[in-house]
Amino acid sequence: MNSIIRPRRLRRTEAIREMVRENHLTASDFIYPLFIHEKDFKEEISAMPGTYRWDINGLIKEVTRAWELGIRCVVLFPKIDDSLKTEDGAECFNEDGLIPKAIRILKKEIPEMAIMTDVALDPYSCDGHDGIVDETGKILNDETIEILKKQALTQARAGADFIGPSDMMDGRVGAIRNALDSEGFSDVGIISYTAKYSSAYYGPFRTALDSAPRENSKKIIPDNKSTYQMDPANSKEALIESALDQYEGADILMVKPGISYLDIVYRLSTFSNKPIAAYNVSGEYSMVKSAAMKNWINEKDIVLETLLSFKRAGAKLILTYHACDASQWLQDT
């Protein structure tokens, strides 16, 4: 055979493969999601092996470890006691609440670490939805946004670097941007959950926060979030959401979930000039961890390949529960 073009020439040795490698992973690509609670001990999440609800002291140690591994941003999610949950989720803008308190402590102890927060009502709602639910089961868009603005401002006052609206209410990015700017927080960024799909991959996360929709004898509660989260069948809709969020002032656009939506990551990366983030969500994490615990797969190889696929699809940032493990593996390689 006399073939002039032989792609295998560039695969011949590890050195050559490294020379022509198109995408690379680094610890600074990762945003590390952390669950926190008011208890004075860490508590493993049964549906997410190796992941915990952290107490404040444990949180400081874990964030310090992440910084030392090269991770430069964490995102905080609260497990709120049922006694504090209400229909309007008002605890979300309590200046002395769990999230503002955690932000202030982290900024004192590890000031260099960037902190992202979550803006949505579901952890704080007795109904388990991201917005206010009326008697007919409708999720109230504009009324919810008024609460979200208060939540975002509370987080910014505590020292958050990035606000992460995950609620999927129409117009919330612009409303939050205007609220932040009007209070002097023009330097606080917005990482918008731009294409957040109504996905079955969120199950373990909702277990971690006890944030799934709940039955209520006094009114209708939808058992899913499909009236505000996106239909998994749609891709063009993601471009509409992207254009809106970018116009309204989002700094970074996110796709959630990640693995099953790499086409959306790619489309947004070519459609928008904003950095794209992908969320390697709880269901994806738990599937890998469960299979690895049974020795059905090589956890390290699967995780690094999965994370690399996000970069290859066009993501600049990856939210992943594997962040510390992956960072350590990259150091050891």
Model segments located where?
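N-terminal amphipathic/basic leader segments beginning at the initiator methionine
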Residues: 1-21
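Alpha/beta enzyme core
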Residues: 2, 13, 25-31, 37-333
